[in-house]
Amino acid sequence: MNSLIEQQVAEIGIEAYLDQHHHKSLLRFLTCGSVDDGKSTLIGRLLHDSHQIYEDQLAAIYTDSQKVGTTGDKPDLALLVDGLQAEREQGITIDVAYRYFSTKKRKFIIADTPGHEQYTRNMATGASTCDVAVILIDARKGVLDQTRRHSYIASLLGIRHFIVAINKMDLVGFDEERFTSIRDEYLEFAEKLNKNIEIKLVPLSALDGDNVVSLSEQTPWYKGDSLLTLLEDVDFVQEQESSDFRFPVQYVNRPNLDFRGFAGTIASGLVKVGDKVKALPSGKMSTIDRIVTFDGDLPEAYSGQAITLTLKDEIDISRGDTIVAADDDVPLSHNLLADIVWMAEAPLEVGRQYDIKVAGKKTVGSVQGIRHQVDINNLETFTTETLPLNGIGLCEVVLNEAIAVDAYQNSIDTGGFIIIDRLTNVTVGAGMVREALIDKTVVSTGDFSAFEIEFNALVRKHFPHWNADDISKLLG
């Protein structure tokens, strides 16, 4: 058992311990950066030095370190996170690994993301739910292409707090000039990113624990806080609660004739009993009657809470609709301008129809044009006709029906969407809405069914010698 937890339970009792634990805020953060920068070792060190490893786990790490470890006589703490056999054999991270730990001030969920370029889509998946990005830089190598790539993706996915951990300082003798040089280079690059990002830098050694949980005597010139202290002090809850109210409906709960509730998780903002709201896309108004949870009714609820809302009026609301404040002006549009991260081996095809899923809403749409692709090593843009695997581009998306969306930077849940291949049902891309465009003439699919359009696309792909016309371009 974990001796620290055992001691705390003995001191205050199990009920008091659980109650104290329940009321801590939860922070989700990811570690990212170039390959072999020490991401998994850093997470292992955080867990070890904050006393979050059980005795049997620690014993197993010592045993495994003798077989596949890379740290000599010291325990290889990266093995706490690198669970796949292929990861341990190669000494790299492939999948996104999640770990949980807590301190006296806060609970944490860590996403350890891969550094290799071919796993960039895995990194984007891990970043999509995080509040903070811990970006590791090897003090010997400095800022690399993958460092810039991950910083850009984290910025694109709406993360507003960066902690740049300059790792392996022990290998450069904890040299202040080396730290300063890397800091200046990174901050110069970061000027091209979102201007709302808060960036803090910390020198550390994940292998030996310097400046990870507590400040190190090796860096008397560093006047900031340790990594753990920085994570504990990040103020992100207030940002979520101060946003406009957004409630995507996931399920209509009607257990009997006397109850009709709308279940889901609040994407952003606050809601109180008595608030005037409207349902989108219908635009019909009503008033919040009850906020129902498993533990009883609440007078108010905030971002991240799973609740069921009941209204005073019987209005038509279905799964995929969004409930917002009555005075919020949320655009309804068929046309979106969005940044798309492509995650499939086959490139994105302009004009091809895909399933588009926004929050709980599923519809059909296509990319009608790619304005540019981003070279994420230097953030330069260039024109292209398609997006390859791991490519990121600014695209014009046309949907078959008007939906309510926000800019992704304002609301992740109602501004983000996934793209699904209609034939294989595989998620092939992720999109972040920049803005809803003024509706152009909406493509009508009345002349051809979705099956006919997909069948036509297959014929043109596999039997090009038939010279079949693209019927999607004939629709008017």
Curated annotation (Swiss-Prot):
Q: Keywords for this entry?
A: ATP-binding, GTP-binding, Nucleotide-binding, Nucleotidyltransferase, Transferase
Sequence segments annotated as region (G2): 91-95
- Which species? Photobacterium profundum (strain SS9)
Segments carrying the region annotation (G1) are 33-40
Top-level taxonomic group: Bacteria
Care to name a GO molecular-function term for this sequence? sulfate adenylyltransferase (ATP) activity
What is the reaction catalyzed? sulfate + ATP + H(+) = adenosine 5'-phosphosulfate + diphosphate
Q: Where is this region: G3?
A: 112-115
Q: Main role?
A: With CysD forms the ATP sulfurylase (ATPS) that catalyzes the adenylation of sulfate producing adenosine 5'-phosphosulfate (APS) and diphosphate, the first enzymatic step in sulfur assimilation pathway. APS synthesis involves the formation of a high-energy phosphoric-sulfuric acid anhydride bond driven by GTP hydrolysis by CysN coupled to ATP hydrolysis by CysD.
Task: Write down the top EC class of this protein.
Answer: transferase
**CDD domains in the record:** CysN_ATPS (cd04166), CysN_NodQ_II (cd03695), CysN_NoDQ_III (cd04095)
> Which amino acids does the record list as binding GTP?
33-40, 112-116, 167-170
- PROSITE patterns in UniProt: G_TR_1, G_TR_2
What biological process terms from GO does the record include? hydrogen sulfide biosynthetic process; sulfate assimilation
Q: According to the UniProt record, where is the region G4?
A: 167-170
Q: What is this protein called?
A: Sulfate adenylyltransferase subunit 1
- Self-association or partners: how does it assemble? Heterodimer composed of CysD, the smaller subunit, and CysN.
Q: Which stretches make up the tr-type G domain?
A: 24-241
